[in-house]
Every structure is written in structure tokens, then in C-alpha cells.
């Protein structure tokens, strides 16, 4: 890679992971498209960390995610498994057989109207099989900003979104998509429901070799591979796929960082007994096995609990979302993910994945929690110290790891990112001679303000902080969730007027927290209450009773890591 980027290879495992990933890649794509805008801050994030350059058979330059994704049969909708950039119609039409032919033509799945609109604006696949790009001469970045003659882009509606590929606006490399054909996405039969089923998938030579081949393809072209980020469904059989994938990565690429994001969709209901028990077992097995093979593991969910007792989903002061819609939940989680992963994607002075994990995971604490303020509430005329002082002494961010409210818990170490605040708002603009209303108002730089605020909130705790000018992109197809924000994401009184919100400031954090002690112990308690004889179907998928006993022991040992007062400064 040019420029010495510290490359990261992303693995997306599961359908909800596909939803989060689609929003994540759309946000990366939107940021690429703004890189040449004179109003934008200079490049703070290095896209080459996540993307790779390539060429089609016809010499067209491409810039595609360094990505391997796995999903089930029936989950792609109109998206082709080989992608759209590299397809050659002339090769497709070349037939060596000279005898009589019988043609069987499969009916194409209708393309989502939003994607039709997006593709027609971007370019066309001509009759000679060459992708003719209308507005992207070198493959990097998106279309330029709309002009007066540019038709307004179509915005996808919630009703039009059935699967994640319905709103993915990024072209993928042919080596990205790996379909598990033996299980179905739709229907009640043939589902990938249990951890043991997922483990078995990557024990099969067919799928293991396919994953290894794709890994080697991407890894061998890297100059400095810093590691892997895994987006993995925890609630279904993909927890087993993720566990085996992490084990494979640890065995083959020792010394590289492996950061796993365990994803769980919106709220669940007490009446769905089998689904809830399976979710509990999959989550517990997934957390324990992923922790064993990853540098760091972070559950991500808008739910209030990982256990059997349903808790209401989290709420945000300036967001209105439907927790039953994966399209909404995944957008919020992708925004948090885009923020907390900033340290290992920086252009200058990046923190490697390994160093980030080492800082947060001391004394065996390899599971961390995430939290975010989306959007960060900066009103017109306010400075950063003004906004931070409004939080008082409370932990400011909304919890995103289904571990309950962070108030009253202990933080052992944290990595914090605040992005999207204009430099003019970083410090307080007091009239000369006016005494500063707080110690934060007396600071001379935004970085100093953020560091001092974190020290006030968590005295003596190891904190790493980053302050970026670059906001988080929330242009369509990101859903319209913001209740009182201007287009640049400033918090307003009343409903916004005019243009939709395009970008927002976000305050995100990863924390090694004592809340995990209660969460993991509660998970173990729920498991001890199960009569496993009633769930023979889960056990028949490849899990033994001894495995459950070992799981309970591992969960309790992991929970003990977060008990007591030990920290880096104790």
C-alpha cells in the first residue's frame, strides 16, 4: 500500500453484522467523497487502512474495502456474489461447447429503487462489460457535491429495506463475499441457530479453505498488516463461526491485533422462549470463545441486557429510532464503531490495534464496553467547555454494550474519541478580565480540555484521548433519526428547518469497566437455571454437557477480573 498504511482486514460474519457493516462502509465512502472539499479539515483518517486499490480486467482503477463477509443463502437480494466492478460480460458469454445448448435463466431479484438511483448516478455497465464511471475518474471517492442541475438522490425508506445489501452503496471485490449455502437466511427450516452449528461450518474443509484462501489474498498484498477487526453476530450460530475464525487468525497470524465486535440486534420479547434461550447460550459461548482468541472483545447492542430478563433499549436525547428495525439499530452502532476505531485509523501518530488492546485489557480484562453520545450536544454559540460542563459529574455517554447504566461503576482504563467539533469552538472565548467559570474554561487547547475533563471524571484512570475535526457522515442512506440538529450536526431548539443532517459530532469511548462483573455473573446465573434436557436441539448441534460446565467456569473467572479496585495506578 502506498504511504505506509497500517492495514486492517475486516471480517463481517452474520446478517446483523452485514447491516452494521453496510452503514459502516457507506460512512467510509461518504468521507472519501468529501476529501477534496475545501471546507473539510485536512485528512485525519487514512482510508488506506481499510481500503485496497486494484484494477479490473480492463484496467479500470478500483478502490474497494479490504473485506471478507460471510452470510447465508438468500441474504444478498439483488447483490451479486462476485460484485459488480470486475464482471466481464464478454467472458461470461464465451462458450467453448459447440453442441446443442439449453438455456436456463434464473429470474433476477428486483433491485431496490434506492440502489437503482444510486447506480444510475454513479455509472453504467456497458454492453462490452466495462464499467463506465460518470463521476469518479480514479475510483477513489464518491460523486461530487450536487449542483443545481443534479437530481435530488432517492432516500431509501424503512419499508424498502429487507436485507443489508438493499442499502449498501459501496462496490465490493469478488473475493469479499462468501456465502454459506447449507443454511438459509429466510424461513423456519435450515437456519444457522446454534453456536455448535457455526463452529462446524469452519471445521468443514470447503469453508475453511475458502476463508483461508481469501485471507491469504488480502494479507499477502499488505505492506504492514496491523491486524483484523471482526464484526460478528453473537445471538445466533455466527457466534460459533466467529469463534473459529478468531482461532484461525490467532493460529496463522500471531502477533497481529484481533479486535472483535460482538453484535446483537434490538430488543427481544419474553414470549419467544426458544429464541431467547438460544440467544443466551450463543452469546455466552461466543463471548468466552472469542475472548480466548481475540486481543479485545466488545459487545455492541442497543439492548439493556445480555441476559434472559428483557430490559428496554437505550435512549438518546437527540435521536428518535425504532429499536425493532435493524436498519435503525445498525446505523447507530456503526456510528459508534466509526468513532471508537479512530485510534488505529489515524494518518499521523496512530495507535496500533495491539497497543490499543494492551492498554485496555491489562490483568486479563479482554472484554470492554462501548459508549457514545450521538450527536455530541454542542449548540450554536457554545464552546467545548460549556458543553462538557453541562454533563456535571455523571458519566456522559449512552451505554452500548448491554451492561446497564455506567453510573456507580469503576473504570479501569479507557480510550476516548471526540470528533466533529470546529476548532473555533474548542476553547472558551472569554472577554479579557473575565474569570473562567471552570478549570476547563482556563485551558488553552481542545486536547488539554478533553484530557482534563477525563481526569476530573475518572481520577487516576489510564485514559487515551483523541480530538478530531472530522465529523461522522450521516448522509443517505443513513436513516433520518435526528430530532433537533442542523445539517452540520449542531443541536438546535425545536425542529430543524431546511436541509437534512449530513454530518454530526460524536463522543465515543471504549472502557474496561466494573459493570462487566455484574453482567458476566448475571449471564452465568441465567445459564445455571437452564434445564439443558429441554434444549437438546442446541446440544445436538455439537455442544456437550461438559462444554456448558466449562463455559460457566470460564464466565465466572472472566467476571472476577472486573471485581475489586485494581487499576493501572493502584
From Swiss-Prot:
Q: Which GO terms describe its biological process?
A: mitochondrion distribution; mitochondrion organization; positive regulation of mitochondrial fusion
On this chain, the residues bearing Phosphoserine are: 495
Q: What is its main location?
A: mitochondrion
Keywords carried by this UniProt record: Cytoplasm, Disease variant, Membrane, Mitochondrion, Mitochondrion outer membrane, Phosphoprotein
Q: Which family does it belong to?
A: Belongs to the misato family.
What the protein does comes down to: Involved in the regulation of mitochondrial distribution and morphology. Required for mitochondrial fusion and mitochondrial network formation.
Q: What is this protein called?
A: Protein misato homolog 1
Q: Which organism is it from?
A: Homo sapiens (Human)
Could you tell me the gene encoding this protein?
MSTO1
Amino acid at each position: 500500500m502506498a504511504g505506509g498504511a497500517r492495514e486492517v482486514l475486516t471480517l463481517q460474519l452474520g446478517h446483523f453484522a452485514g447491516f452494521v457493516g453496510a452503514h459502516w462502509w457507506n460512512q467510509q465512502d461518504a468521507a472519501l467523497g468529501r476529501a477534496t472539499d475545501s471546507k473539510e479539515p485536512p485528512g485525519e483518517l487514512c482510508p488506506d487502512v481499510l481500503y485496497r486499490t486494484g484494477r479490473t480486467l480492463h484496467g479500470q482503477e478500483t478502490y474497494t474495502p479490504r473485506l471478507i463477509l460471510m452470510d447465508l443463502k438468500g441474504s444478498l437480494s439483488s447483490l451479486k456474489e462476485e460484485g459488480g466492478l470486475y464482471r466481464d460480460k464478454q467472458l461470461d458469454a464465451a462458450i467453448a461447447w459447440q453442441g446443442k445448448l439449453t438455456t436456463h435463466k434464473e429470474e433476477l431479484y428486483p433491485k431496490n429503487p434506492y440502489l437503482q438511483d444510486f447506480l444510475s448516478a454513479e455509472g453504467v455497465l456497458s454492453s462490452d462489460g466495462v464499467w463506465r464511471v460518470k463521476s469518479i475518474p480514479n475510483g477513489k471517492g464518491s460523486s461530487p457535491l450536487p449542483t443545481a442541475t443534479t437530481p435530488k438522490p432517492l432516500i431509501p425508506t424503512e419499508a424498502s429495506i429487507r436485507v443489508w445489501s438493499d442499502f449498501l452503496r459501496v462496490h465490493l471485490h469478488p473475493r469479499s463475499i462468501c456465502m454459506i449455502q447449507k443454511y438459509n437466511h429466510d424461513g423456519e427450516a435450515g437456519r444457522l441457530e446454534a453456536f455448535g452449528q457455526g463452529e462446524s461450518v469452519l471445521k468443514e474443509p470447503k469453508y475453511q479453505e475458502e476463508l483461508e484462501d481469501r485471507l491469504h489474498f488480502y494479507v499477502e498484498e499488505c505492506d504492514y498488516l496491523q491486524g483484523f477487526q471482526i464484526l460478528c453476530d453473537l445471538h445466533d450460530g455466527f457466534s460459533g463461526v466467529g469463534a473459529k475464525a478468531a482461532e484461525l487468525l490467532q493460529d496463522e497470524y500471531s502477533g497481529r491485533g484481533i479486535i472483535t465486535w460482538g453484535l446483537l440486534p434490538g430488543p427481544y420479547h419474553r414470549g419467544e422462549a426458544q429464541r431467547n434461550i438460544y440467544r443466551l447460550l450463543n452469546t455466552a459461548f461466543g463471548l468466552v470463545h472469542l475472548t480466548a482468541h481475540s486481543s479485545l472483545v466488545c459487545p455492541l447492542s442497543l439492548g439493556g441486557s445480555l441476559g434472559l430478563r428483557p430490559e428496554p433499549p437505550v435512549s438518546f436525547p437527540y435521536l428518535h429510532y425504532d429499536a425493532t428495525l435493524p436498519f435503525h439499530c445498525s446505523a447507530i452502532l456503526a456510528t459508534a464503531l466509526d468513532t471508537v476505531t479512530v485510534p488505529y485509523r489515524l494518518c499521523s501518530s496512530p495507535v496500533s490495534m495491539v497497543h490499543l488492546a494492551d492498554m485496555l485489557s491489562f490483568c486479563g480484562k479482554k472484554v470492554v464496553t462501548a459508549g457514545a453520545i450521538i450527536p455530541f450536544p454542542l449548540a450554536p454559540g457554545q464552546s467545548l467547555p460549556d458543553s462538557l460542563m453541562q454533563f456535571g459529574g455523571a458519566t456522559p455517554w449512552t451505554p452500548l454494550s448491554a451492561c446497564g447504566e455506567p453510573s456507580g461503576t469503576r473504570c479501569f482504563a479507557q480510550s476516548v474519541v471526540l470528533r466533529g467539533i470546529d476548532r473555533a469552538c474548542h476553547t472558551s472565548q472569554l472577554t479579557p478580565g473575565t474569570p473562567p467559570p471552570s478549570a476547563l474554561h482556563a485551558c488553552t487547547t481542545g486536547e488539554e480540555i478533553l484530557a482534563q475533563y477525563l481526569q476530573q471524571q475518572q481520577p487516576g484512570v489510564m485514559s487515551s484521548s483523541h480530538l478530531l475535526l472530522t465529523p461522522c457522515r450521516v448522509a443517505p442512506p443513513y436513516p433520518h433519526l435526528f430530532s433537533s440538529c442542523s445539517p452540520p450536526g449542531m443541536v438546535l431548539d425545536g425542529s430543524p428547518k431546511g436541509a437534512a443532517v449530513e454530518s454530526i459530532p460524536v463522543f465515543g469511548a471504549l472502557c474496561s469497566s466494573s459493570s462487566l462483573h455484574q453482567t458476566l455473573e448475571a449471564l452465568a446465573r441465567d445459564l445455571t437455571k437452564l434445564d439443558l434436557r429441554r434444549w437438546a436441539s442446541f446440544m445436538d448441534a455439537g455442544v456437550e454437557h461438559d462444554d456448558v460446565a466449562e463455559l460457566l467456569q470460564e464466565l465466572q473467572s472472566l467476571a472476577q477480573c472486573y471485581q475489586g479496585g485494581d487499576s493501572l495506578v493502584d
